[in-house]
């Protein structure tokens, strides 16, 4: 049987039942209260006191609460943790209510619908997305930033493409149909880290024509309708600031999957997941929040339309050379507030008087911006100037109406300027005259009584009063005052005349405050009429800010304007990695050239670790991306094709949460490139195949090189430690060898960080191990082994060379390992042969026809054994390390496991 709760608790339970997945902030006087399970959970999450109250049932009801004036911070905390908060307000005056005060939920705050507070990052969008899958495996995606009013809409051809878009926008909340499969819901939560919500209404209302009236395709109409229904249902108001939905296709921009963006560190670094150290960090010379958000959007979606790119470059070049005008623009833009989000607050009815002052100050900069831009020597400035709308009438309204330094609250008065409204002026005169009368009264009473310390004061409990200290009480004429309050050291009195004047003053002040609030709300409604113009202005200012930012960084870092080739030529002279150069300094960084054309489509890069291969590959990709967003590039000269896609496989990071090893991740990322790349794409593959055995890895690497060369024709930079692959240059006509240079000086290796034509002759792996701090005796032993191997390689007896170095005493271990290697080769052979059978046959034919005797034989790790030389004297620690090293089975180790083993050995020797 249900407990007999009080009417107020029954009201709470009735409303809570409508929002079971949200915390219900239930307004009671000056507090938002929570009850039952909400109270218990909120007390834990917000670290506030859990108490209880009598709710009419058998047991006391758990309760906690927060003051209404500080509730926003608590709401943000819950939303940041992925919760929703339903805000339930009193919607009638408690003084006139009969029974329980009527209450309604006025807004449902969700992770994707934050409008203000610390949960919004200044230079990042805060997107809510809706996703609709269709039977033909296409997906409708609509997303909006409620704080700015932006709405975007697209149709995607595959789940992979959809995933890339979801990662690019970083949606905080994804809205889907309630009948979605549980497995799909779980994947959305885990892979994209977004809160999941549900909405089933997918019909477009007539009043949404300004947002979606131009959307004609049914799939897109269904998708955007789901978004709008969810927004209206949760926000419970008209969303007048939502802009017309921008329809786009991903094919209109350079495509990069999330892995490529992460490998290239476009907006965040691999290690810290932070902005510092990324390309965005380098380029962000914007001085407005709007410009910062737009720059990230440009970087996420580089252009592929050459005319659009050249228009941006023209503007950047003009600003780059117009030094004084650019600095004038930067100074003016610094005084522009976030107009986009100010407009959102105005539309929501959340804007206070300080917001309107910020809007006025921002608009006051527009005439100067127009004048400066108009003076630039560029024909295209007229279009931008036309969008820089100064909204003079609005500035005049705000200048006449709003105080320069108004209070934060809009219900405490002192917002509206004198002279704006006659009624308000009359109330203010009455209040001011009354206060002048009070001052005169105080002076008169001091003179009559002779009490110099007598004063007239005020508090909200007793109103106005006359205060006299106790030593002066005998000086008061009999019957002059009426005693009101006794204090420790004084008495307070009133008079009939004082109370009469008090009533007039307080009435004037009360009516003045009420009228100011009404006037402010009316002014805010007038400002709403300017929302479309303000949004157009905000976009123009954001674009101007991004262009000046690109011009600033291009000027300060000595970048050059890229040229574009229709002949698929890539010619970079003196190219630099923009971020590495900034970190190291221009004097330290070593620039490199890169040349590719139709006859030179692939560069096979060899050379030692730490020599700069990966940096070289990344700088080529970053140069292309910077060029296609309309920025100058870090080089002495750059001619580039326009790339439709960029694919990368750089670095190794196990996806443990998905149960994927380094090698599986490597193969999946390689598959994306091989499946989707075109001859207009750019592919960067760094040491493909290192996550598996040597033969497997080399076979796959060679097969991939041949496949890209023969079937795709994309510009490709392929680095490898399989030096045997360099012989492919003779059989693949569009492949060229290049290498990262290194030299030895006095037995030490020096990495020159220069890329030169031809294959590398050595890997210098032992030198890298020495730099890592491995024991000297171990390093010397490795050098001896290497010398024997190189000598044996020259005599055609590699196995014998390794055997001589291994020694008799390890015979049993090595024989067992040799047997294991033989068995492994049988297993690998059948699999690898299937992968590369045709490629190997084709290569053999090429070699036969060319008379090429180059051998592709890989060094055997476990050859026949021979007598060992005399062992050098080793310490006990070194013997333990050597014994541990001999037990290592390299064939079954990933690179990460090998690195961990080296670390263990290093610790053992310390």
Swiss-Prot record:
One GO location term (cellular component): cytosol
Binding site for ATP: 607-614
PROSITE patterns: DNA_MISMATCH_REPAIR_2
Pfam families named in the record: MutS_I, MutS_II, MutS_III, MutS_IV, MutS_V
Gene Ontology molecular functions: ATP binding; ATP-dependent DNA damage sensor activity; damaged DNA binding; mismatched DNA binding
GO BP annotation list: mismatch repair
Keywords for this protein: ATP-binding, DNA damage, DNA repair, DNA-binding, Nucleotide-binding
InterPro entries recorded: DNA_mismatch_repair_MutS, DNA_mismatch_repair_MutS-lik_N, DNA_mismatch_repair_MutS/MSH, DNA_mismatch_repair_MutS_C, DNA_mismatch_repair_MutS_clamp, DNA_mismatch_repair_MutS_core, DNA_mismatch_repair_MutS_N, DNA_mismatch_repair_MutS_sf
Family, similarity comment: Belongs to the DNA mismatch repair MutS family.
NCBIfam families reported in the protein's UniProt record: mutS1, PRK05399.1
HAMAP family xref list: MutS
Described function: This protein is involved in the repair of mismatches in DNA. It is possible that it carries out the mismatch recognition step. This protein has a weak ATPase activity.
Name under which the protein is recorded: DNA mismatch repair protein MutS
Organism: Geobacillus thermodenitrificans (strain NG80-2)
Lineage per the UniProt record: Bacteria, Bacillati, Bacillota, Bacilli, Bacillales
The encoding gene: mutS
């Amino acid at each position: 049987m249900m407990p007999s709760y009080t009417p107020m608790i029954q009201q709470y339970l009735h409303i809570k039942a409508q929002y079971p997945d949200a915390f219900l902030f239930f307004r009671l006087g000056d507090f938002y209260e929570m009850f039952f399970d909400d109270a218990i959970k909120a007390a834990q999450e917000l670290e506030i006191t859990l108490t209880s109250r009598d709710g009419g049932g058998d047991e006391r009801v758990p309760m906690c609460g927060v003051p209404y004036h500080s509730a926003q911070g608590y709401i943000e905390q819950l939303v940041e943790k992925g919760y929703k908060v339903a805000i339930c307000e009193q919607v009638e005056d408690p003084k006139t209510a009969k029974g329980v005060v009527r209450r309604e939920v006025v807004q449902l705050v969700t992770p994707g619908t934050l409008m203000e507070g610390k949960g919004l990052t200044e230079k990042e969008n805060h997107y809510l997305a809706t996703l609709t899958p269709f039977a033909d495996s296409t997906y409708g995606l609509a997303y909006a930033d409620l704080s700015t009013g932006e709405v975007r809409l697209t149709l995607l051809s595959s789940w992979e493409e959809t995933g890339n878009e979801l990662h690019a926008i970083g949606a905080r909340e994804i809205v889907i149909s309630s009948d979605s499969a549980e497995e799909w819901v779980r994947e959305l939560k885990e892979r994209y880290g977004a809160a999941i919500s549900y909405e089933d209404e997918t019909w477009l209302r007539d009043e949404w024509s300004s947002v979606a009236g131009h959307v004609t395709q049914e799939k897109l109409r269904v998708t955007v309708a789901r978004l709008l229904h969810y927004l209206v249902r949760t926000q419970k108001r008209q969303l007048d600031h939502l802009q017309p939905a921008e329809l786009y296709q991903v094919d209109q921009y350079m495509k990069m999957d999330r892995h490529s963006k992460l490998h290239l560190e476009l907006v965040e670094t691999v290690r810290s997941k932070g902005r510092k150290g990324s390309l965005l960090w380098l380029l962000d010379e914007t001085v407005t929040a709007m410009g910062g958000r737009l720059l990230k959007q440009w970087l996420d979606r580089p252009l592929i339309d050459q005319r659009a790119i050249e228009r941006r470059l023209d503007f950047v070049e003009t600003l780059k050379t117009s030094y004084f005008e650019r600095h004038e623009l930067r100074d003016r833009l610094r005084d522009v507030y976030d107009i986009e989000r100010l407009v959102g607050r105005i539309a929501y009815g959340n804007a206070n008087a300080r917001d309107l002052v910020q809007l006025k100050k921002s608009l006051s900069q527009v005439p100067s911006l127009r004048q400066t831009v108009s003076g630039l020597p560029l024909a295209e400035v007229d279009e931008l100037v036309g969008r820089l709308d100064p909204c003079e009438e609005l500035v005049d309204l705000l200048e006449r109406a709003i105080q320069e330094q108004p209070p934060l609250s809009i219900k405490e008065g002192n917002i509206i300027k004198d002279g704006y409204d006659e009624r308000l002026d009359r109330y203010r005169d009455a209040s001011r005259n009354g206060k002048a009368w009070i001052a005169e009264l105080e002076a008169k009473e001091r003179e009559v009584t002779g009490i110099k310390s007598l004063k007239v004061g005020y508090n909200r409990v007793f109103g106005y009063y006359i205060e006299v200290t106790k030593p002066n009480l005998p000086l008061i004429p009999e019957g002059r005052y009426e005693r009101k309050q006794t204090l420790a050291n004084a008495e307070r009195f009133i008079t009939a005349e004082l109370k009469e004047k008090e009533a007039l003053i307080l009435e004037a002040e009360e009516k003045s405050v009420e009228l100011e609030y009404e006037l402010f709300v009316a002014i805010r409604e007038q400002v709403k009429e300017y929302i479309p113009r303000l949004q157009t202005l905000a976009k123009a200012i954001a674009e101007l800010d991004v262009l000046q930012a690109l011009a600033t960084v291009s000027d300060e870092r000595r970048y050059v304007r890229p040229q574009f080739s229709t002949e698929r030529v890539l010619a970079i002279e003196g190219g630099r990695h923009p971020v590495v150069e900034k970190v190291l300094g221009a004097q330290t960084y070593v620039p490199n050239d890169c040349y590719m054309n139709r006859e030179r489509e692939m560069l096979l890069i060899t050379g030692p670790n730490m020599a700069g291969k990966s940096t070289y590959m990344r700088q080529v990709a970053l140069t292309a991306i910077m060029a296609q967003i309309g920025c100058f590039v870090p080089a002495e000269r750059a001619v580039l094709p326009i790339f439709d896609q960029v694919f990368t496989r750089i670095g190794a990071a196990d996806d443990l949460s998905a149960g994927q090893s380094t090698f599986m991740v490597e193969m999946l990322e390689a598959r994306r490139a091989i499946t989707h790349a075109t001859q207009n794409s750019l592919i960067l593959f760094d040491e493909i195949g290192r996550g598996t055995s040597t033969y497997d890895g080399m076979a796959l690497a060679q097969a991939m090189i041949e496949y890209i060369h023969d079937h795709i024709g994309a510009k490709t930079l392929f680095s490898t430690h399989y030096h045997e692959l360099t012989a492919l240059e003779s059989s693949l006509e569009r492949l060229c060898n290049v290498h990262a240079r290194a030299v030895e000086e006095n037995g030490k290796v020096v990495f020159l960080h220069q890329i030169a034509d031809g294959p590398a002759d050595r890997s210098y792996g032992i030198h890298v191990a020495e730099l890592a701090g491995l024991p000297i005796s171990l390093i010397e032993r490795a050098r001896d082994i290497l010398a024997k191997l190189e000598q044996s390689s020259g005599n055609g007896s590699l196995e014998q060379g390794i055997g001589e170095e291994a020694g008799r005493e390890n015979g049993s271990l090595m024989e067992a390992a040799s047997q294991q290697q033989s068995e492994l080769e049988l297993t690998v052979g059948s699999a690898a042969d299937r992968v590369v059978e045709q490629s190997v046959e084709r290569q053999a034919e090429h070699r036969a026809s060319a008379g090429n005797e180059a051998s592709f034989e890989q060094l055997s790790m476990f050859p026949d054994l021979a007598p060992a030389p005399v062992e050098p004297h080793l310490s006990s620690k070194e013997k333990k390390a050597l014994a541990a090293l001999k037990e290592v089975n390299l064939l079954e180790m990933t690179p990460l496991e090998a690195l961990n083993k080296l670390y263990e050995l290093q610790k053992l020797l310390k």
